[in-house]
Structure formats: structure tokens, C-alpha cells
Amino acid sequence: EKLTLHSKWITTLVDGLLNPVEYLERLQAAFDDPAPNHRPWVVVEKVLARGEHLNPLWPVAGTTGYDALDVLNGLFINRRGARLLRRFFQRLTGDCRGFREEVYESKRQIMEGSLRSGVTILVHELKRLADASWTTRDISIYALEEALSGFMASLPIYRTYLGDGQGTAFERDIVSDSLELAARRAPSVDRSAFAFLRSLLLDDPPPEEGLAPRRAQIVARLQQYTSGVHAKGVEDT
């Protein structure tokens, strides 16, 4: 960033940040100090799902254009061909699952394979947090792992940006919907594990005294991790 500020022409691309909003605010503030009337043109590489919009509070001009390309590329695609390709695929493989179920299974596969270590770390952090309160200490580590994996596999977007009042109504709704879907997909898993995740992510109810900093850190790392799971599960698997 210092090189960018000094040269005024070098561009950088950030990916997978724990708190991209804070980074963007600090970047803009750094430009404001020497030249408050000459703010840089900053765009972010952000893939937006259907119905998802860039948070208007972010100090950026927009995205690098994936959302525009999604619309433009549609001009070159015959939608009727999708049905033919789907039928051919089903005849060839015998797999009649829909795309959403394919994505769900692919993301579960990734979390049980190459991204296993990260999931394990998150689960143990969740268990330590749950053990800190008498209302959640009985939730087993198995239930937490199944609830977490099911939630991340059911989340239809790369990540959310909840915490510090940054989250949008869309993000809160999609977290609730994804947790409900994950719970339906795993009827044998303790419901209290899903309720614990919901309380953690949506900050409802607020944390007990002394637990807020730890909760905020776990939420930040969990949200950071879902983007990698989505990228590997949807794009690469």
C-alpha cells in the first residue's frame, strides 16, 4: 500500500482478507491525508451471487466487473441448451441431482479433504467458546462440526461481512436460511448446535459479558473461511 500511495499508479489486488472493509477504509484514509480532494478510483474483485449487491457503505467505486460480465456473457448463451446438456450428463453419469445438491456435496468433499485442517481449527474454537457458557457447554464437538460444515456447504455466496454493524439485511437473511437448510439436511444433528451458530453469527442474543471479543474473532475467521470453501467447492470441484 505504501508503494501504491507513493507511485500513484501501481495497482494491487487483495484477496481473502479477514476484514476487507477495514482495509478499504484505511486505504482511502491514507489517500485523504495528503490529497483529500483527489480520492483514488478503487474497485474490488467481488463475485456477486444472484440477489446479492455490493454494500453501499464500502468506500469503493464498484467491482472489477464480474457482475457485468455475467450479464454480457448471457448474450452468447442459448438457455435452451442447458436442458439438453443436463439430460446428456444424467444419461452419461446416472446422476440426477440438481446443481445445488452437487455444490453441497462438492463443498463437503473439499472440507473433508484439502481444507480439513481449517475446519478442525474452527470447530475447536467454537467448542471452547461454547464451553465458556453454561447454556451451550453441553453441545458436542461432533454436533458443532456437522453444523458448521453443513452451514458452510449450504451458504450460496462466497462470504458475509457480519460484525461491527457491517452486515446487510440480505446477509442476515441468507445466514438464517442457510442454517435452516443445513439443519434440514442433517436431522440427526443436535439442533442446539445450529442455534449456537445462529446466535454467534447474528449476535442474537448478545454475548455474555467478557465473551464478545472472542466471539467477534471467531465470526471474522469463519466468514473468511467460507470464501475459500465456496471457491474450491464451486469453481474447482
What does each model-found stretch correspond to?
Residues 1-9, 15-237:
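Alpha-amylase-like alpha-glycosidases and glucanotransferases acting on alpha-linked glucans and related
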